[in-house]
Design a protein with these regions (language model features):
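Short low-complexity stretches enriched in small and charged residues
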Residues: 18-25, 64, 139-141, 173-174
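N- or domain-start disorder-to-order transition segments that initiate the globular core
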Residues: 1-33
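Glycine/small-residue-rich interface belts in oligomeric ring/scaffold proteins
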Residues: 35-86
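A diffuse structural propensity rather than consistent per-protein peaks
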Residues: 34, 51, 238-242
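A broad, structure-centric signal for solvent-exposed, well-ordered loop/edge residues
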Residues: 24, 31, 40-42, 50, ...
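A short alpha-helix capping/helix-coil boundary motif
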Residues: 32-35, 166-168
Length: 289
């Protein structure tokens, strides 16, 4: 059973293991948390000492561990070599995925993202811009040769953050977007490994320097979750926005007819996308914001 707690450590401390518990110890206190309760461990500072036994047990329990750099930005995460007993079998399937099937599934996933962007613009009152994005959605073709995804993103971000906004800018807005996307990317990467696949082999993403091409492909419909939080806090500092981004771990979202935690949604969504790649008749699940 998956844990439900997100543990954030942001002070000088030592983390160790004893009797199925994570032991947190700093200068003033000691706390114990049973590993079965933990879903995500976010280490926000470099001033933390971990025992190797704890690291081993975190891997055993499939707990997502995210490491931050000296600027408190996500820089790495802990990933096991093998996520399941038949990883070699699933890897052979992944390598043999049909290109036409990959195109169909990638395009379906991107269509969901574009629709979610349009719906969010509409919910913010930008009805004309929302319709423009929907028009781009209706013209989407396999693997998007006309880059309608890019055109939709330009309308979307310029509407939310101004015509002068660019994703290449050095700003608190972009820092917050990147921070939030990295949190979601890490969650998808964990589920991909647990499904027996390699994160490097994507559907369309094929950047040789990107270790998470497949996660980057599958996570696309979920990006507007981060966009909403950043937009609603766009006049706040990066530190304040970052704190609000942590609510993705505790909030529930509607999926498959019920309200669920994001980690559970991502787990189910990833499994079903990979099932659809292995068996195309299964179809891609739908996620709507």
């Amino acid at each position: 059973m998956m844990g439900w707690r997100t543990v954030i450590v942001n002070t000088h401390s030592k983390l160790s293991y004893k009797n199925n518990h994570l032991i947190f110890k700093d200068a003033s206190r000691t706390e114990l948390i049973h590993l079965s309760e933990v879903d995500i461990l976010l280490l926000e500072t470099t001033d933390i000492v971990l025992s190797t036994m704890l690291i081993k047990r975190l891997v055993d329990e499939n707990i997502l561990v995210i490491f931050c750099d000296d600027k408190r930005l996500p820089t790495a995460y802990l990933m096991p070599y093998y996520g399941r007993h038949d990883s070699s079998l699933q890897l052979s399937r992944q390598i043999a995925w049909n290109e036409d099937v990959k195109a169909e599934i990638w395009t379906t996933i991107i269509a969901q993202k574009i629709l979610n962007q349009a719906f969010y613009l509409g919910s913010c009152g930008f009805l004309e811009k929302s319709q423009s994005v929907i028009d781009l959605y209706h013209g989407l073709n396999l693997f998007d040769p006309s880059n309608r995804e890019g055109h939709a993103a330009r309308i979307y971000f310029n509407t939310l953050f101004g015509n002068d906004f660019s994703r290449e800018q050095d700003s608190d807005i972009n820092a917050a977007l990147d921070y939030g996307y990295t949190l979601i990317l890490s969650m998808f990467a964990r589920e991909i490994v647990l499904s027996g696949c390699m994160t490097q082999f994507g559907l369309k993403h094929a950047n040789q320097f990107n270790q998470f091409n497949l996660a980057s492909d599958i996570m696309e419909p979920f990006r507007p979750i981060i966009d909403r939080i950043v937009y609603e806090n766009r006049n706040s500092s990066f530190v304040k926005i970052k704190r609000e981004l942590f609510t993705i771990f505790s909030d529930t979202f509607h999926y498959n007819g019920k309200d669920m935690y994001l980690s559970n949604i991502i787990s189910d969504y990833t499994k079903k996308v990979i099932q659809a790649l292995n068996q195309p008749e299964k179809g891609v699940p739908e996620f709507r914001i």
